A protein has these predicted regions:
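An N-terminal assembly and electron-transfer interface module characteristic of large anaerobic redox
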Residues: 1-242
């Protein structure tokens, strides 16, 4: 098997049983190297879910992109999609902002202004910042707390840092933490599971659903199938995550 990629379907694993798991999947039999960068990999099947699109996985959320024009312009393609045309907002940075950091004081005001101008109050505002703020050493958590006070709703950071792609916490790892940090603690239910790690739903006839139901799981949550913020909050009832 050396030098050859190995894979196994869920059905094949089930047929083998727990006592006959392939050695390729048993970390105690050989070294399995997994770079932090692999956690940030987005497969073609994910339909292009980068930091910005993933940050809007929460139902009824909106995003404020704080960046120079050159960094934010590629979002215009996403903005043209029906599902996102009214969910992206921009706070452009100029040279003075970069030198003085004055744009940080504008963010809470911008968030409050956006929320006041919307007919429906968003569930959360995601603040997307770029490598510029990474180099400036911006404390975005503090800025988001100020924005929460100004707007009266949850505000979370979303780091579009290409610089950290190979680091301990790549952008896609951090955006997942931001998304699920909004779940409020609830009493756990033994027959509920969350499917995490991706932002598009599995196909309806995926064999994983039948396997989980056969194991006694009654409710399977996927963030992409949540219709509203209330349903998203029910994900905190899950007994375990897969």
């Amino acid at each position: 098997m050396r030098g050859t990629a190995y894979y196994c379907t869920v059905e094949e694993l089930q047929e083998r049983g727990r006592d006959n798991i392939p050695e390729q999947f048993r970390s105690n039999t050989h070294l399995i190297y997994s770079s932090p960068a692999t956690l940030a990999f987005n497969s073609p099947g994910a339909e292009g879910f980068g930091v910005k699109r993933a940050g809007l996985a929460i139902p009824d959320s909106i995003m404020l992109i704080v960046a120079p024009g050159c960094c934010g312009r590629n979002t215009s393609v996403l903005s043209s999609m029906r599902a996102y045309h009214d969910r992206f907002y921009y706070l452009l940075m100029d040279e003075t902002d970069i030198v003085t950091g004055r744009h940080l004081k504008k963010i809470p005001k911008a968030v409050a202004e956006i929320c006041e101008g919307l007919e429906k109050k968003p569930s959360v505002v995601m603040i997307c910042i770029t490598c510029v703020d990474a180099l400036l050493g911006t404390d975005m958590e503090r800025v988001c707390r100020k924005a929460e006070e100004a707007a009266g709703l949850s505000v979370k950071p979303c780091y579009m840092y290409a610089l950290t792609r190979e680091g301990r916490k790549p952008p896609m790892v951090h955006v997942r933490q931001s998304i699920y940090s909004l779940l409020e603690p609830k009493k756990k239910k033994g027959n509920v599971v969350n499917l995490l790690g991706f932002f598009s739903p599995l196909v309806d006839d995926c064999e994983l659903y039948d396997l989980l139901h056969g194991a006694g799981v009654k409710t399977i949550h996927e963030i992409s199938r949540c219709k509203d913020y209330e349903e998203y909050q029910t994900m905190s009832e899950a007994n375990f995550n897969l």
